[in-house]
Regions:
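Short, conserved catalytic or interaction motifs in soluble domains
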Residues: 11-14
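Hydrophobic residues within well-ordered alpha-helices
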Residues: 27-28
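Acidic donor-binding loop at a coil-to-helix junction in glycosyltransferase catalytic cores
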Residues: 17-23
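Hydrophobic, well-ordered beta-alpha structural blocks that scaffold small-molecule cofactor pockets
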Residues: 20, 37, 43-171
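Conserved nucleotide-sugar donor-binding
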Residues: 1-9
Length: 171
């Protein structure tokens, strides 16, 4: 992080929620670019007592609300709405947060046969074979637990979505 990129994003803000994540998203908005270093640069000690794991400001609900707030400012999301991959609890929670930000939900994609053809929060649930065919202009958001993220990425890629462009694995 450079001083210029830090200042361009407005620095840290004191508000409820994950301040580091908020800063990174504002840096991204202001034009900063991120990359993965080819090798580990530090060793991180992660204990259960760390604030990230124990303070309400860093709870999953705050992380999701921060993600929804920034996703709702993306021009493509504003113009085209979203489809959420995952109609379970995580997807429904993200949908509610996006609706509160006035983002149009076009529907859900799910792999569970019993859900396909039904609705979640009043929006249609389509199967994986419909991905890329239903509401293709909408931005795809991966809203599943950690164990299923790779499968959503593979499915999105096979349907022609590009991560960071028209697909975001946001949960």
């Amino acid at each position: 992080m450079t001083r210029e990129s830090y200042l361009a994003a407005g620095g840290y803000r004191v508000e409820k929620g994950p301040e580091d994540y908020d800063l990174w998203l504002r840096m991204l908005e202001s034009g900063a670019r991120f990359f993965q270093a080819p090798e580990a640069l530090i060793e991180w000690r992660d204990s259960p007592s760390r604030l990230t794991r124990s303070h309400d400001d860093y709870a999953e609900t705050q992380m999701r609300a921060t993600k929804a707030r920034y996703l709702s400012r993306l021009p493509a999301v504003i113009e085209n709405g979203v489809i959420l991959a995952g109609s379970g609890p995580i997807g429904r929670k993200m949908a509610k947060l996006l609706l509160a930000e006035n983002i149009e939900i076009r529907g859900f994609i799910d792999v569970a046969p019993r859900k396909i053809g039904s609705t979640a929060l009043g929006f249609p649930i389509w199967g994986p074979k419909d991905l890329g065919k239903k509401e293709r202009a909408a931005i795809l958001l991966g809203c599943v637990g950690q164990g299923k993220r790779a499968a959503v990425r593979t499915l999105a890629k096979s349907a022609g979505y590009r991560e960071g462009h028209d697909f975001f694995a946001c949960c």
